A protein has these predicted regions:
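Segments forming oxygen-rich coordination pockets for charged ligands
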Residues: 1-151, 165-169, 182, 203, ...
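Short amphipathic alpha-helix with an adjacent loop that forms part of the alpha/beta core around
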Residues: 156-166
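Short hydrophobic/aromatic-enriched beta-strand-loop microsegments
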Residues: 150, 191-198, 217-224
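Beta-loop-alpha module in the N-terminal Rossmann-like domain of NAD(P)-dependent dehydrogenases
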Residues: 177-181
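ADP-ribose/adenylate-binding Rossmann-like module
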Residues: 169, 174, 185-210
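Short, acidic/turn-prone active-site loops that include or flank metal/cofactor-
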Residues: 136-138, 154-158, 176, 198-203
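Active-site capping/gating segments
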Residues: 200, 218-249
């Protein structure tokens, strides 16, 4: 059973879900759950294993689901007597630990030029699973992207075949308007939490006008971040790349750009 539970955790994380794994670390008295009992719960509601059933398990499940939402590991201890935490009659105590496992964020970089490489170099320090796509093997190779998965081929084909999920961010930084347009058309309707395209305002406007002519992109094109990234006040490639990744994390975490100093001063003013 333990192997099945661990496999469940791995499989659900691979599918892009957060998962809680609860282990009872100690018990005494007549606790229905014994030390070593395990239970895993996926963000999607699926579960496997048991930590004793009844009121105890129900309480642990509620707290484990809350831990998934809060993204926080928790230790717990419950008194199982009549006057204890759960109003149970079996007596004893149980202690345990719930750990949250997270899916690794995937970053698809379309375009292996200087901007794509700069985005990659920063992204690998942030624990992204990086995939680089290009139609030029002299750019998209393991010398330039040693820790990425490399996919080289005709853009139409490789973009059609690349797999995405809700943990995927997509950065489109190809060498030309025509390739950017193909990338947006192939990827914008696929699942992702972020998709952005580089380009000047004129280039972006032209690309969007062309894409919007096709009704199948009507509901999805608005999720495209273009021009991509934050305004860093610089044309340096590494700073542009940093602005792109900052935008990705802001979108992922449901935030907007803000200086902590300004937020702090606003809070002070409200308390005056």
């Amino acid at each position: 059973m333990e192997r099945d539970i661990l496999k469940f955790v791995n499989d659900e994380v691979e599918r892009g879900y957060k998962v809680s794994l609860t282990i009872l670390t100690d018990s005494d008295g007549s606790s229905p759950g014994k030390a070593g009992a395990m239970m895993a719960i996926s963000e999607n509601g699926k579960s496997i294993g048991t930590v004793g059933g009844g009121s105890l398990e129900n309480k642990i499940m509620i707290e484990a689901k809350k831990a998934i939402i809060d993204e926080k590991d928790v230790e717990f201890e419950y008194n199982l007597g009549a006057n204890g935490d759960l109003g149970m009659l079996c007596g004893g105590n149980v202690r345990g630990y719930t750990k949250i496992f997270y899916p690794q964020n995937k970053l698809i970089i379309v375009g292996a030029g200087h901007v794509g490489k700069a985005v990659y170099e920063t992204a690998v320090t942030l624990d992204f699973d990086v995939i680089v796509l290009d139609d030029r093997s002299e750019y998209a190779n393991y010398d330039n992207f040693p820790n990425a998965k490399i996919i080289v081929g005709d853009y139409e084909k490789i973009l059609e075949e690349v797999e995405t999920d809700k943990t995927t961010a997509i950065v489109i930084v190809t060498r030309g308007h025509a390739y950017d347009k193909v990338a947006v058309e192939k990827l914008v309707n696929k699942e992702s939490f972020y998709i952005g395209m580089i380009g000047s305002k004129n280039k972006v406007f032209k690309t969007l006008q062309e894409i919007k002519k096709d009704a199948k992109y009507k509901d999805s094109i608005d999720k495209l971040y273009a021009p991509i990234g934050l305004d860093m006040g610089s044309n340096k490639v590494k700073e542009i790349a940093l602005g792109i990744l900052c935008e990705i994390f802001l979108v992922k975490n449901g935030k907007k750009p803000a200086f902590m100093r300004d937020l702090f001063q606003e809070k002070i003013k409200k308390n005056i």
